[in-house]
Swiss-Prot record:
<dbReference type="InterPro" id="IPR016095">
    <property type="entry name" value="Ribosomal_uL1_3-a/b-sand"/>
</dbReference>
<dbReference type="InterPro" id="IPR023673">
    <property type="entry name" value="Ribosomal_uL1_CS"/>
</dbReference>
<dbReference type="GO" id="GO:0032543">
    <property type="term" value="P:mitochondrial translation"/>
</dbReference>
<dbReference type="Pfam" id="PF00687">
    <property type="entry name" value="Ribosomal_L1"/>
</dbReference>
<keyword id="KW-0809">Transit peptide</keyword>
<dbReference type="GO" id="GO:0003735">
    <property type="term" value="F:structural constituent of ribosome"/>
</dbReference>
<feature type="transit peptide" description="Mitochondrion">
    <location>
        <begin position="1"/>
        <end position="19"/>
    </location>
</feature>
<comment type="similarity">
    <text>Belongs to the universal ribosomal protein uL1 family.</text>
</comment>
<protein>
    <recommendedName>
        <fullName>Large ribosomal subunit protein uL1m</fullName>
    </recommendedName>
</protein>
<dbReference type="InterPro" id="IPR028364">
    <property type="entry name" value="Ribosomal_uL1/biogenesis"/>
</dbReference>
<dbReference type="GO" id="GO:0005739">
    <property type="term" value="C:mitochondrion"/>
</dbReference>
<comment type="function">
    <text>Component of the mitochondrial ribosome (mitoribosome), a dedicated translation machinery responsible for the synthesis of mitochondrial genome-encoded proteins, including at least some of the essential transmembrane subunits of the mitochondrial respiratory chain. The mitoribosomes are attached to the mitochondrial inner membrane and translation products are cotranslationally integrated into the membrane.</text>
</comment>
<keyword id="KW-0496">Mitochondrion</keyword>
<comment type="subunit">
    <text>Component of the mitochondrial large ribosomal subunit (mt-LSU). Mature yeast 74S mitochondrial ribosomes consist of a small (37S) and a large (54S) subunit. The 37S small subunit contains a 15S ribosomal RNA (15S mt-rRNA) and 34 different proteins. The 54S large subunit contains a 21S rRNA (21S mt-rRNA) and 46 different proteins.</text>
</comment>
<keyword id="KW-0689">Ribosomal protein</keyword>
<dbReference type="GO" id="GO:0005743">
    <property type="term" value="C:mitochondrial inner membrane"/>
</dbReference>
<dbReference type="InterPro" id="IPR005879">
    <property type="entry name" value="Ribosomal_uL1_mit"/>
</dbReference>
Length: 285
């Protein structure tokens, strides 16, 4: 015959309740810990580990080939931007950056992807100084870049005398004016890291191309299994961000094509996120 035994109700309050809760969580985690994490679990042989790694690689490659629209987190870019802008309302403009992150699937030992993106709409304003004694190039540069410092020997003399302050971020020059820069303003530009040099790639006869690439260029490099790069600010228009995303896609694919490997990396799922917003999957194919 079964008998009913009354169990006294224990009420735990205050710090003890919190400790009890965390202790229960720990016990639950210990009881249901996967066998592979247990100290008594047998270690895998080299062949077993290799097969497991190969299986995971096949799974990641299969996932990379799935269309972005299959993800429950997918949104068209314009709709995703609306949500991300909403998440940044009230934040300082300096923190309202739209980031693009692309997962990279590759075999072990494959070199990480790297390169640079030239954005149609740069994320920040960069002031540039260009030095050349070629009058035709000076005229061309002054017409194309009126808001930047463009000049020859006269500009070098003004920097040397302190008439013009060194408030620019980058400097470029043609080979004909490099000796004057080295002899007159190297001690001024060098410590600030803006002295043009062949080693840095800031000296060229085609100075116009250097300026064009530098004004909107942003380097990227694969970290771990992903590439992350800023593609805009929340106050950019949808069109400006879309153009920057297209440029990033072209640069990523160029980096993949330039890989010297029989089995190059594959670009997988891509998400858009903001500084304080969620990650939203977009179509990056």
């Amino acid at each position: 015959m079964l008998s009913v035994v009354a169990i006294p109700k224990i009420c735990v309050t205050g710090p003890a309740r919190r400790c009890f809760f965390h202790t229960a969580k720990k016990l639950y985690a210990d009881d249901y810990k996967p066998a592979a994490m247990s100290s008594n679990a047998p270690s895998l042989t080299k062949d077993q580990a290799k097969k497991r790694e190969l299986k995971r690689l096949v799974q990641r490659k299969a996932e990379a080939k799935r269309p972005a629209t299959a993800s429950p987190l997918y949104m068209p870019v314009t709709k995703a931007l609306r949500y991300l802008r909403a998440a940044e309302v009230g934040r300082p403009q300096s923190q309202q950056t739209i980031n693009l992150t692309t997962l990279v699937v590759g075999e072990r030992g494959t070199a990480p992807l790297s390169g640079s993106v030239t954005f149609p709409k740069p994320l920040r304003y960069i002031k540039i100084a260009a030095f050349t004694n070629d009058e035709s190039k000076l005229e061309e540069l002054r017409e194309k870049y009126p808001n930047h410092l463009i000049g020859g020997a006269d500009l070098v003399a003004k920097i040397k005398s302190g008439e013009i302050s060194v408030d620019f971020d980058k400097a470029f020059a043609t080979p004909d004016i490099v000796p004057a820069l080295q002899s007159q303003v190297a001690r001024i530009l060098g410590p600030r890291g803006v002295l043009p040099s062949v080693k840095k790639g800031t000296v060229s006869d085609d100075i116009s191309s250097l300026l064009q690439e530098s004004l909107g260029s942003m380097p990227f490099r694969q970290r771990g299994n992903s590439i992350s790069i800023g593609v805009g600010k929340c106050y950019f228009t949808d069109r400006e961000i879309l153009q920057n995303i297209i440029s990033a896609r072209a640069a990523f694919k160029t980096a993949v094509d330039n890989q010297k490997s029989k089995k190059p990396n594959i670009l997988s799922k891509t998400t858009l996120s903001s500084t304080h917003g969620p990650g939203i999957v977009i179509d990056f194919a």
